[in-house]
Amino acid sequence: MKRLFTLITIALLALPALACTNLLVSKGASKDGSVMVSYAADSHTRYGTLVFMPRATYPKGEMLEIREWGPGKFLGHIPQAEKTYNVIGNMNEHQVLIGESTWGGREEFVDSTAILDYGSLIYICLQRAKTAREAIQIFTTLADEYGYASSGESISFADPNEVWFMDIIGKKPKFNKKGRMKTREPYG
């Protein structure tokens, strides 16, 4: 019985280790006035992944194919931006950084009709935003227009001047409330 209890305890303690981890530091909280975000994608399926998306220009009316981050399942199309920025990892050429921590949620609230999952939204925003505020605006506008196809996520947005934190969760199709909340991290 003692052995079984020990095994169950170890298994339960290991569960939190499956979550991604972000640490956010605002300009006023760092000694030298730097904004810092650390992001550990604790997913065993993404170790070693380093995304690279070169800056590009596209013809007006071009459509962007959306595939679910990870499994690669086709979700739909959205209009492509005419100009995109260079992205390496989770940062773009304007030093906009986006990270995430998955916390889940009720499966019945994941919108099965939605086109954009959290990973697609992160990389689309990095390709299109010059500031953290602009990334949040793009993220929320696209999620409102095309639906959010993931469970609960805490999204970290940063640029050289600000750091923001936003929670978002899926909503049933045609559910009338927005499933998100954002806050700016305090200066100090």
Predicted feature descriptions by range:
Residues 2-10:
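Sec-dependent signal peptide recognition
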Residues 7-8, 83, 123:
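Generic detector of short alpha-helix boundary/capping microenvironments
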Residues 14-18:
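N-terminal signal peptide c-region/cleavage motif recognized by signal peptidases
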Residues 20-118, 138-188:
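A contiguous strand-loop segment
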Residues 110-112, 120-129:
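Second-shell loop/turn segments in exported
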